[in-house]
């Protein structure tokens, strides 16, 4: 097939005599035309190959750009998620800072309040009745204590009053046990020292006494059962 393609298309050329000047000129012209045609075909084939190569290269570049675009989108989503988490964390930290800014101060003031209460408790009742000045002083100290606790309460400090509640180790500290068969086990029966919390944090656990020997509370439904049947 290649030989047929490379032959001149004019069949009359086979009849030409190369020794004849006119035929030789015709053969030369035919050869020139054939070469020009082949060069044109070669250029067309080269242009087609180049165009195909450019298409392939363009397709490859598009594939690379699409991959880069996907990666950039993924990075952007990760950065956006990190920024949102940072925003929430910062907002939470700011809220905590506002809510718990007075934690140490409040704890110190509670110690002062305890000292005031202990001082009041050491004064015998008959002494107060016998000395009006001492009674006035005692009332003034008690008012100061109440004002201090009210000020702390306005800033989010809450008093824990757990008497009659189930013992909670997160908010209570058991100091002793009281045998009482009529109350469920681990019921707070006495508060030795009041506890305080700020927000959901404990400033100071309540020191309490708890019951022992009564019915236990079922963990599933809260029903009381006797200790003998437990």
UniProtKB/Swiss-Prot annotation:
Instruction: Please classify the protein's predominant subcellular localization into one broad category.
Output: cytoplasm
Coiled coil region boundaries: none
Does the entry feature the keyword Transcription regulation, yes or no? no
Biased composition of type Polar residues is found at 221-230
Name a single GO cellular component: cytoplasm
Task: Please name the InterPro entries in this protein's record.
Answer: GrpE, GrpE_coiled_coil, GrpE_head
Name the domain of life.
Bacteria
What does the UniProt keyword field contain? Chaperone, Cytoplasm, Stress response
UniProt xrefs under SUPFAM superfamilies: Coiled-coil domain of nucleotide exchange factor GrpE, Head domain of nucleotide exchange factor GrpE
Q: Which GO terms describe its molecular function?
A: adenyl-nucleotide exchange factor activity; protein homodimerization activity; protein-folding chaperone binding; unfolded protein binding
Query: What GO biological process, any one, is recorded here?
Result: protein folding
UniProt region (Disordered), positions on chain: 1-28, 209-230
Q: Which Gene3D superfamilies match?
A: 3.90.20.20, Head domain of nucleotide exchange factor GrpE
Homology family? Belongs to the GrpE family.
So what does this one do? Participates actively in the response to hyperosmotic and heat shock by preventing the aggregation of stress-denatured proteins, in association with DnaK and GrpE. It is the nucleotide exchange factor for DnaK and may function as a thermosensor. Unfolded proteins bind initially to DnaJ; upon interaction with the DnaJ-bound protein, DnaK hydrolyzes its bound ATP, resulting in the formation of a stable complex. GrpE releases ADP from DnaK; ATP binding to DnaK triggers the release of the substrate protein, thus completing the reaction cycle.
Record's subunit section: Homodimer.
Q: What is this protein called?
A: Protein GrpE
| Gene transcribed to yield this protein | grpE
């Amino acid at each position: 097939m290649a030989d047929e393609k490379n032959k001149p298309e004019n069949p009359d050329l086979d009849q030409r005599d190369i020794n004849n000047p006119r035929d030789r000129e015709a053969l030369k012209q035919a050869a020139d035309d054939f070469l020009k045609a082949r060069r044109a075909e070669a250029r067309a084939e080269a242009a087609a190959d180049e165009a195909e190569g450019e298409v392939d290269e363009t397709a490859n570049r598009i594939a690379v750009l699409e991959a880069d675009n996907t990666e950039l989108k993924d990075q952007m989503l990760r950065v956006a998620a990190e920024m949102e988490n940072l925003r929430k964390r910062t907002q939470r930290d700011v809220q905590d800072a506002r809510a718990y800014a007075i934690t140490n101060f409040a704890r110190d003031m509670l110690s002062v309040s305890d000292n005031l209460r202990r001082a009041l408790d050491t004064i015998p009742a008959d002494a107060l009745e016998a000395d009006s000045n001492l009674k006035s002083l005692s009332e003034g100290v008690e008012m100061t204590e109440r004002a201090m606790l009210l000020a702390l309460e306005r800033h989010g400090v809450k008093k824990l009053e757990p008497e009659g509640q189930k013992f909670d180790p997160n908010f209570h500290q058991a100091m002793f046990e009281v045998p009482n068969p009529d109350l469920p086990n681990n019921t707070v029966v006495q508060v030795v020292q009041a506890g305080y919390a700020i927000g959901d944090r404990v400033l100071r656990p309540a020191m309490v006494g708890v019951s022992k020997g009564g019915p236990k509370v079922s963990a599933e439904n809260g029903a009381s059962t006797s200790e003998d049947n437990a």
